[in-house]
């Protein structure tokens, strides 16, 4: 069968993914005697479609799980999808509005019917896209956060925490989303600086013709003011202690109070206190027993309590009230000001502090083991720098607001009796049974009980995810949870370190007394090549599916990983996907070259034992490095090591060393070794580029349907000959120098040349002389005691080599070249010497790294010595 000149990923990818699925390669069993290796996919939202962050996260997980599978572990990658309360409800409401249907006109049941219909239609889109990337999940284990199992887990945990006193209901200041019309947790609010205004407003002092000036960024909340506060030691306002003031427009009398909370240097040093609409003002009001006047509706419009501008939006009122203050003589001045505004993570609405009755989790006690076990490295963060962020948050953790004023989600398992008594139970029947335990309620029926209408924060199901996907709450002794939990690694983004990572660790210790995962690998933020965060809304993010169609899934995977150092933001350039595709073509062409060779036992080809031994050593050297990279979660570094091993060492050197002359056969020994090398290279590349490696694996030799690289054994590194590697590297340096001389002298690449040395040839040269002659197109090698006239020199490890020309060389040109090279190596030597003179580097860097730098230094010194000698020689000095 004639092989295509180009690798075609479209023809290959669907074929092999379907084959892997049909063979059950991705299925994991708790009955296995293998070592388990478990990853739980961070469940994407059902509202989502694949974006570049998903591509990065999914690729990294697939690399880890495929490698573990090849290493003989029971690799279990559990996929899932999240119900995403706020995001999904927003989508469903918009869909209904487009049909002329308002949510307020529907019953809860009718709305949820629409939501489930929407979920069935759109909820699996992103999962199908993830499959196109090659994700080797155990799809039989697919979970949805509102499936029966996770839903029961949520109820059990809520009841358990409530009964232990960790969950409570209380009226507190919370973050309110006026667009989503729901409460938000503190970490669901994103803060960003916004250009605004500082309004200086006059408040008249009761019983005098004096006034006090107060600076505020929110004049619309004046209508809810219940006090003015000054610092007790601010001498400017000593005369106002115990006085009263009049609220402009509202004409309400309020007290002037004192509190050290006031910042004397902000504005005028006086603070208007609006307890209903500011977190700090509320705390101040509680200390001083102030009235709380809520002037806003849940949608951010002014309510009847405001007394003015009823039904108008808060930001419209801001402008109108400023104009009224100006017209009535209350506005002293307006200054530009930069405010830090809180925005809803989901709807991007400006968040309103609001006094509201909500459900909360007391988090401080639950956080203690989560804090300790990360700091002592029981759970390891990669990179470790994220421990500091994690520690700072847990040191200042606040109670978690878990109720949301939505319909889509897990309805809170709390039930109200007619007198307002709250009973927490699995369902109405269980709540009624609990009520009947009290004789007062013995005549109640289910019709007398109503369930809390709110749903739980989406993260309340997500924090249980590593346990609930294995039914660890419904059946804590089942084989899945006993075998697959805890998981090995969580791959996630640092922006949800608080939302999800910290809470999962809390849940792990609270409900299983074990860690949920052993490692957390934090990806970076995907940015464009200009450094801007990639976003479809900004128009700077490509469609991953379009990239897959153009470059192949392998090309896109490699492109992402080429640009993604762990924990650091990555600058993505579409050219990296092109580089990934080119790499696939390089592998395909190497395979075609090998398959095109004729194999004959009586081949006249010279013995290639040295080349075979060298590449075997080089493979094991790089494999050792790759394993070190994986241990430290430097996944991109591991890929780059493989890339260089294949592109440079295998294709550029080894294949050229053993390639037979045109029309000549290759020996069976060399051919077999070469095929085996390619097979081993395909194995270590497979986790990164699963499709092309599987295709070439099967093309390389006949195989059964079950004999797939997906389940082939991962190569084991063995000891290797360092001296052989060093000698080969020197030989390759010499060949490269010869090639460079050809280019600079405009000599045909294949024109045979003479090569002289004025010293005895080194041992490394002798061992690789056949390949130096073959790849350098050298037809004669000799030693000359005297100088070689009309020649160009090159230098390797202190040895000078000369290539004579039939025509006289341009002495000035050769002097210029030597001086330029000398200048470069002198600068190089200075840089290396500076690094080695740094005590901190020498003491803290790995010994192997320091040794490499010392070798660079000695090599540079030797080269400089030879070049200086050659300069003297040809200049006649």
From Swiss-Prot:
A motif ('KMSKS' region) lies at residues 533-537. GO terms for cellular component: cytosol. It is found in: Cytoplasm. One of its GO terms (biological process) is valyl-tRNA aminoacylation. ATP binds at residue 536. The keyword Disulfide bond does not apply. InterPro entries: aa-tRNA-synth_I_CS (IPR001412), aa-tRNA-synth_Ia (IPR002300), Anticodon_Ia_Val (IPR033705), M/V/L/I-tRNA-synth_anticd-bd (IPR013155), Rossmann-like_a/b/a_fold (IPR014729), tRNA-bd_arm (IPR010978), tRNAsynth_Ia_anticodon-bd (IPR009080), Val-tRNA_synth_C_sf (IPR037118). It comes from the Bacteria. Keywords: Aminoacyl-tRNA synthetase, ATP-binding, Coiled coil, Cytoplasm, Ligase, Nucleotide-binding, Protein biosynthesis. It catalyses: tRNA(Val) + L-valine + ATP = L-valyl-tRNA(Val) + AMP + diphosphate. Its main location: cytoplasm. Pfam families: Anticodon_1 (PF08264), tRNA-synt_1 (PF00133), Val_tRNA-synt_C (PF10458). Its EC number is 6.1.1.9. One of its GO terms (molecular function) is ATP binding. Residues 806-826 form a coiled coil. Catalyzes the attachment of valine to tRNA(Val). As ValRS can inadvertently accommodate and process structurally similar amino acids such as threonine, to avoid such errors, it has a 'posttransfer' editing activity that hydrolyzes mischarged Thr-tRNA(Val) in a tRNA-dependent manner. ValRS has two distinct active sites: one for aminoacylation and one for editing. The misactivated threonine is translocated from the active site to the editing site. The C-terminal coiled-coil domain is crucial for aminoacylation activity. Belongs to the class-I aminoacyl-tRNA synthetase family. ValS type 1 subfamily. Monomer. This is Valine--tRNA ligase. The gene is valS.
